[in-house]
């Protein structure tokens, strides 16, 4: 019976407590947080050792199973005691491991939360420091683009000017050629006039020669008529003489004499006819030669006139072509000049617009920086108030342990009224930032560094604006006044800081043993300082 009761205990409760529990724990570890595996695995050696013990024990128990019937109750009690001690040890180790694992998980969660907080702060700081640089990079890129556009426009203008000079040189060459053609035309016109005069003279000479030919032909015809009439008269006389001789003189024979006379007259007539024909032929040849010469001269003059007209027409066409080319080039040059002027004016308008946008953006950036500085001053004032109230509360708490309840309530009401006035004064002006004594020196130095950085960025932006636009005389005087006022304010702040440091040193030497009266006096002095600083700033603003 004991053997049957021992085996179920070993098979169920032992496995459930020593095997299933670590498995459930490990599965929860995997699902809960994966980063703790290394930590858990580093501390899981006892579990494996316990498992090895269980395996060895189970193997030994398996080997002892046939002889369990021979065991007595004392051996069973010893084995159960050993198992209980092993269970308690393993349970303690598992509890330790669970506790350490829970602590590791809590630590990891804390580190993750801290990491998230630090990442948020880093993101905020990066945004704060990257916004001005991003704007600056954008405007610098825009300025570079505008400068490149201006350089391109200048290069294009120079190229157009070179092209214009080339066109002007071509125009001058064409004008010189035109003048040469005009001179050659005038010369040709002069030669044409001379040729026309020669042609007119040749025509007149030809007309005169034709008239002389007509007169000579008339004279020839007249001489022929006269010659024929003379021949007729001579024949009539000869016939009459023959008749009269035949009638009157019958004695002598006159036929021979008449024949001689007729022969003489015929010879004389033939000679005269021959002389007249020779004279006519010579005269006709002379007139023909002169007419031919005049015809050749007229033909040459006509040819020269036609050639001159042809040359004049060609030169006129060439002059018209040059004139059209000149007009086209002048029109193209005017269009190029108009286009260039329009492009330059458009680029200038764009540059002016971008400069105005840059100027407005710089002014907005300066305004934003100023607002940021004001907000920073307000934040510092609020931090100072919080620190002052904290110090008051700490002082009140320390005072509560030594004073009665009535004195604590009265002192607390008086101190709260005093510090309420001081807090109101701190909100009114930013000079309260450097006049408090309860603010930590490290935080004040850090805030002063931030203020200095903001002022440097504002001064750099103003310097860039001053470089972009030359200041006038009134602006230069205002800038000098602003610089003097800034130097005076810095000197006053340095003096106040030195006074505060000396007062803080005195307070540290005194060991913080101030009472309510001293605190009220200090608060009143701080209020007076704040009011004096506010009045000084108001007077400066009025000036």
UniProtKB/Swiss-Prot annotation:
The modification Phosphothreonine is found at residue 520. GO terms for cellular component: axon; axon cytoplasm; cholinergic synapse; cytoplasm; cytosol; growth cone; intermediate filament; neurofilament. Residues 526-543 have a biased composition (Basic and acidic residues). Changing residue 265 to C: In CMT2E; uncertain significance. Residues 253-271 are annotated as: Coil 2A. Residues 272-280 are annotated as: Linker 2. It comes from the Eukaryota. The extra mass and high charge density that distinguish the neurofilament proteins from all other intermediate filament proteins are due to the tailpiece extensions. This region may form a charged scaffolding structure suitable for interaction with other neuronal components or ions. Forms homodimers (in vitro). Forms heterodimers with NEFH or NEFM; which can further hetero-oligomerize (in vitro). Forms heterodimers with INA (in vitro). Interacts with ARHGEF28. Interacts with TRIM2. This is Neurofilament light polypeptide. It comes from Homo sapiens. The gene is NEFL.
């Amino acid at each position: 019976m004991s053997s049957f009761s021992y085996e179920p205990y070993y098979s169920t409760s032992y496995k459930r407590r020593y095997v299933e529990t670590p498995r459930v724990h490990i599965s929860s570890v995997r699902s809960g947080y994966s980063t703790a595996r290394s930590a858990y695995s580093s501390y899981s050696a006892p579990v494996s050792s316990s498992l090895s013990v269980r395996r060895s024990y189970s193997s030994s128990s398996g080997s002892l199973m046939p002889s369990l019937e021979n065991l007595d109750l004392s051996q069973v009690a010893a084995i159960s005691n050993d198992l209980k001690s092993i269970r308690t040890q393993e349970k303690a180790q598992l509890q330790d491991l669970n506790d350490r694992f829970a602590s590791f998980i809590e630590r990891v969660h804390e580190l993750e939360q801290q990491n998230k907080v630090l990442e948020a702060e880093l993101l905020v700081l990066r945004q704060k420091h990257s916004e001005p640089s991003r704007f600056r990079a954008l405007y610098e890129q825009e300025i570079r683009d505008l400068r490149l556009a201006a350089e391109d426009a200048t290069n294009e203008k120079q190229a157009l000017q070179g092209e214009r000079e080339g066109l002007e040189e071509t125009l001058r060459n064409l004008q010189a050629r035109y003048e040469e053609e005009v001179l050659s035309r005038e010369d040709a016109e002069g030669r044409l006039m001379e040729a026309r005069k020669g042609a007119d003279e040749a025509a007149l000479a030809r007309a005169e020669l034709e008239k002389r030919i007509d007169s000579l032909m008339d004279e020839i015809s007249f001489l022929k008529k006269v010659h024929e009439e003379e021949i007729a008269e001579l024949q009539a006389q000869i016939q009459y003489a023959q008749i009269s001789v035949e009638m009157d003189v019958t004695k002598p024979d006159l036929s021979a004499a008449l024949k001689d006379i007729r022969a003489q007259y015929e010879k004389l007539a033939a000679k005269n006819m021959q002389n007249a024909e020779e004279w006519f032929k010579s005269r006709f040849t002379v007139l023909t030669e002169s007419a031919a010469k005049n015809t050749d001269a007229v033909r040459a003059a006509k040819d020269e006139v036609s050639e001159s007209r042809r040359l004049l027409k060609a030169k006129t066409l060439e002059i018209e072509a040059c004139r059209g080319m000149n007009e086209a080039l002048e029109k193209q040059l005017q269009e190029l000049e108009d286009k260039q002027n329009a492009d330059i004016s458009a680029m200038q308008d764009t540059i002016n617009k971008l400069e105005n946008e840059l100027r407005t953006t710089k002014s907005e950036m300066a305004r934003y920086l100023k607002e940021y500085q004001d907000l920073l001053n307000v934040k510092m004032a609020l931090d100072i108030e919080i620190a002052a109230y904290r110090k008051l509360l700490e002082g009140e708490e320390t005072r509560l342990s030594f004073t009665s309840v009535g004195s604590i309530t009265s002192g607390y009401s008086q101190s709260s009224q005093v510090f309420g006035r001081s807090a109101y004064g701190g909100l009114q002006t930013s000079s309260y930032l450097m006049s408090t004594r309860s603010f930590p020196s490290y935080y004040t130095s850090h805030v002063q560094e931030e203020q200095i950085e903001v002022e440097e960025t504002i001064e750099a932006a103003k310097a860039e604006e001053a470089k972009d636009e030359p200041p006038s005389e009134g602006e230069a005087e205002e800038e000098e006044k602003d610089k003097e006022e800034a130097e005076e304010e810095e000197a006053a702040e340095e003096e106040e800081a030195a006074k505060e440091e000396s007062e803080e040193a005195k307070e540290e030497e005194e060991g913080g043993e101030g009472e309510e009266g001293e605190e009220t006096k200090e608060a009143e002095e701080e209020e007076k300082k704040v009011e004096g600083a506010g009045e000084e700033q108001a007077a400066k603003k009025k000036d």
